[in-house]
Swiss-Prot record:
GO terms for biological process: cell differentiation; chromosome condensation; spermatogenesis. Belongs to the protamine P1 family. GO terms for molecular function: DNA binding. Its main location: nucleus. Protamines substitute for histones in the chromatin of sperm during the haploid phase of spermatogenesis. They compact sperm DNA into a highly condensed, stable and inactive complex. This is Sperm protamine P1. Testis. Keywords: Chromosome, Developmental protein, Differentiation, DNA condensation, DNA-binding, Nucleosome core, Nucleus, Spermatogenesis. It is found in: Nucleus; Chromosome. It comes from Hypsugo savii.
């Protein structure tokens, strides 16, 4: 939850939006890292 809160700042998310999106797609494909990665880059959606 702490990470999610930190991600809530828009300016920060906008900067890493591309990087997050790319990594997220790659990670989400694998079941092992899916949870961790998706949670980490969740900021892209909100």
């Amino acid at each position: 939850m702490a990470r999610y809160r930190r991600c809530r700042s828009r300016s920060r998310c906008r900067r890493r939006r591309r990087r997050c999106h790319r990594r997220r797609r790659r990670c989400c494909r694998r079941r092992r890292r899916r949870r961790a990665c998706c949670r980490r880059y969740r900021c892209r959606r909100r």
